[in-house]
Amino acid sequence: MKFTNGYWLNREEYDVNSPKETYDAQQNGKTITAFAPYTRIMSRGDQLNLGTTTITLTSPVENVIGVKLEHFDTNEHGPEFKINNLDPEVAIEVNDQVASLQSGDLKVTLPLRTDFEMKFTANGQLVTQSETKPQATIWNHDTKVNYMREQLSMGIDEKIYGLGERFTNFVKNGQVVDTWNQDGGTGSEQAYKNIPFYISSNGYGVFVDESQRVSFEIGSENVDRVQFSTEGQSLQYYVIYGPTPKEVLHRYTQLTGAIKLPPAWSFGLWLTTSFTTDYSEETVLKFIDGMQEHHIPLDVFHFDCFWQKGFEWCTLEWDKEQFPDPEGLLKKIHDRGIKVCVWLNPYIAQKSPLFKEAKDKGYLLTRENGDIWQWDLWQAGNGFVDFTNPAAVKWYQDKLKVLLDMGVDSFKTDFGERIPAEDVKFFDGSNPQQEHNYYTLQYNRAVYEVIQQEKGADEAVLFARSQRLVHNPIQYTGAATISRSTAQCVIQLRGGLSFLLSGFGFWSHDIGGFEDGPGTPTADLYKRWSQFGLLSSHSRYHGSDVYRVPWNFDDEAVENTRKYVNKLSLMPYIYTEAAHAAAAYGNPLMRPMFLEFGDDDNVYDNATQYMFGSKILVAPIFNDQGKAHFYLPSGKWTSILDGKVYQAPRTGEWVNEVFDELDLPVLVRQNSIIVRNEKAVDAAYDYTKDVDIHLYQIQDGNVSSKVVDEHGQDTAEIKVERANGRIVINTVGLTGDSTVYVHENNDTIKLSLVDGKAEVTL
């Protein structure tokens, strides 16, 4: 949101007041409260007839400094995010010249009785700063609305990322971003998952702790600053110092909540009915059995909207005309070793039998005059469940318990973005502008909690479309994806990478695209999209009016899917990375290149490839000629598919190569241990039994890798030492017969473990 007319002038409708100095400051325990008037105070008379901003400085997590800017001390109506306070040690100095607070390496300094500035430094180096004009309280005298604004400096060549699942350019510099959840598809500037957090290439991040709309101008109003503003009389934000991007994300998730580890089975293949297709018990079993007949392992089957009767979403009851015996059907699916997911949304159509019940009990949002808030968008006479009402939450959860007891394992929590923010009342009196974004958190939490209660914490998982802050185990995108264009794959990927830089660990999308058209997707596109989707953290075939089973395209599509579903063989590596990097440390499983190679300037703009965990590089091919253009940081890289070795020089290297239709670059970085089980037919199995240990281009020194079990607990460890051309392998915790494969240059040496040990001289 822009307030200025060029650099010199403010827009006519705005009155802008900025702190001109920090007049004084006080320490209260581990907090500093400073007072910043809107003019320099040269005499006692200057203290009259002017406003001040109260600046409160805190540190809830080491290397994180919280800043609250407050003009008027107004009542807060909520809702508000829950922020963790780990109560770190801080160093505070307050005297007649300066006020400063230091947490870990990060320090904020406010000089007193001189031109206003607020500097954030680490180890004596500037991180970012707010100066005399950027910070402001702004009054729109036309609309009678007040705003609070902050502007933090950007360095030369500094790049900004994150802000949720955004499908615009990966680097956000020059963009205007409003964090307001909307159902805008994946081809617009709107986003389902708006997260008011950005991460900088300069080793820090900023989280704006406001649930309502926050407007970001990333070098787009003042070109050397990131500006963020919101309605109201106060603004809370946190500066988070790394110095590495991984450490920034770790501290951010310490602040806002840890990433939860999804159950192992969720990492397998999900297949859906698609949306408006015809589906019945016969159709469902035909597709499930078809996957088995084509030797394609399937872990989850998803029923989309029409498991319920049309015009009645949601009834949370099966359409008995299509599914006369749902319990029997779920048992048949479970007997085939497959989990079940069903679709739901937080709305209740007027035709639904639940509508009157919810209306009579006061469980739906109302207008200011007491009428139910309804519209005809999506379902006729849609009402909205009021998740601020504890009784409504329990009522909704009780309906879901029936389904869980019946055999449903998971839910796809669709929608939750188009929540009214005008002429609406919430049960708990929440501010509608704040509730618009916060609603999806309450909706997802209600569903997630009931799964935890019924299935256990280790089995709880959601496929959630919209989001604000809470760390549900899976997020997905895909609505309104245009499947005709290979460019949509790139758009999906950069949206996913932006989202995964916003504090989330796992992500998926609709393989093949959701929106259909004549002749789409082509078999070529389907195969390339399948490779990308099956090498994502979570993998789901889904569409609108076309079934996404591979045999509907061609025989090669079946072969391609079968090949890349073999991601299951990598589950010892994948689940260990998920448990250690994501759940324990706050880093995503799929990650942009700069998270792993922060010292390489060539990777900071790259959003067409990614690291799958810390050791495997994936470069999807987004054209029908098989042309790959990918970047390799310095070192040796080995193809996990055919063993080809690439040697990238010290400065890194761009590679142009043509791959056949069933191949793409999937490369392991040097000095890596990858544990696999080629016999895997499910995602959840014993990751320590009868495994293959692949050692890729081991360098002199020591390297080790832990292996978790299917519950995410450390169970085994592999240690490797190389010296004088000799490699020694020691393992603890493995069972059965395991084999070691030493990949040395272009050769592969096979070894057997004896008493958990092996060695070879090269």
Curated annotation (Swiss-Prot):
CDD domains found in the cross-reference section: GH31_N, GH31_xylosidase_YicI
Pfam family, one: Gal_mutarotas_2
The EC number(s) this enzyme carries: 3.2.1.177
SUPFAM superfamilies for this protein: (Trans)glycosidases, Galactose mutarotase-like, Glycosyl hydrolase domain, Putative glucosidase YicI, C-terminal domain
GO biological process assignments: carbohydrate metabolic process
Membrane topology value: Peripheral membrane protein
Disruption phenotype: XylP-xylQ double mutant retains the ability to ferment xylose but is impaired in its ability to ferment isoprimeverose.
Compartments, record wording: Cell membrane
Entry keyword set: Carbohydrate metabolism, Cell membrane, Glycosidase, Hydrolase, Membrane
Active-site residues from the entry: D414, E417
Expression induction: Expression is negatively regulated by XylR and is subject to CcpA-dependent catabolite repression.
Domain of life: Bacteria
Alphabetical list of InterPro entries matching this protein: Alpha-glycosidase_related (IPR050985), Gal_mutarotase_sf_dom (IPR011013), Glyco_hydro_31_C (IPR048395), Glyco_hydro_31_N_dom (IPR025887), Glyco_hydro_31_TIM (IPR000322), Glyco_hydro_b (IPR013780), Glycoside_hydrolase_SF (IPR017853)
Functional note: Involved in the metabolism of isoprimeverose. Hydrolyzes isoprimeverose into equimolar amounts of glucose and xylose. In vitro, can also use p-nitrophenyl-alpha-D-xylopyranoside (alpha-p-NPX).
Family: Belongs to the glycosyl hydrolase 31 family.
Protein name: Alpha-xylosidase XylQ
